[in-house]
Curated annotation (Swiss-Prot):
It comes from Campylobacter jejuni subsp. jejuni serotype O:2 (strain ATCC 700819 / NCTC 11168). It is found in: Cytoplasm. GO terms for biological process: maturation of SSU-rRNA. It comes from the Bacteria. Monomer. Binds 30S ribosomal subunits, but not 50S ribosomal subunits or 70S ribosomes. Belongs to the RbfA family. One of several proteins that assist in the late maturation steps of the functional core of the 30S ribosomal subunit. Associates with free 30S ribosomal subunits (but not with 30S subunits that are part of 70S ribosomes or polysomes). Required for efficient processing of 16S rRNA. May interact with the 5'-terminal helix region of 16S rRNA. This is Ribosome-binding factor A. GO terms for cellular component: cytoplasm. Its main location: cytoplasm. InterPro entries: KH_dom-like_a/b, RbfA, RbfA_dom_sf, Ribosome-bd_factorA_CS. Keywords: Cytoplasm, Ribosome biogenesis. Disulfide bonds: none annotated. Coiled coil: none annotated.
Length: 120
């Protein structure tokens, strides 16, 4: 692992801790309780994709939350910069995490294949 990869992983780890703290400091009740599942920085650390837990939000609520997060993005960046003493913070791109649903779907398919194989 080269030094740039280590810096990227360190940044991801720090952001995974700081973003929930920053969200908790906001006045918006919808944003305070969001759960950050993962943070993925792109090469160069100019952009960070922040994956959020869907919990029990419907599509309309998700769109509303993403819109609010886009507006609050600069405040979140300022919080991260002030906490870490950074002169620059990655641009945040928020997404709801579909990986768990995808994994559950794949597991169900494999179980079905296994069951069909045993019946044959």
């Amino acid at each position: 692992m080269n030094p740039s990869e280590i810096k990227k992983l360190r940044t991801e780890s720090i952001l995974k801790e700081l973003i929930p703290e920053a969200l908790a400091n906001l006045d918006d009740e919808n944003l305070k309780n969001l759960c950050v599942v993962d943070v993925e920085c792109k090469k160069g650390r100019y952009d960070a994709f922040v994956y959020l837990d869907k919990m029990f939000f419907n599509v309309h609520e998700q769109e509303k939350i993403l819109s609010s997060l886009k507006k609050a993005s600069r405040a979140l960046q300022n919080y991260c910069m002030s906490e870490q003493g950074w002169y620059r913070c990655p641009n945040f791109h928020f997404k709801f995490d579909d990986r768990l649903e995808y994994q559950n779907h794949m597991d169900a398919l494999f179980e079905k294949i296994k069951k069909d194989k045993n019946e044959s």
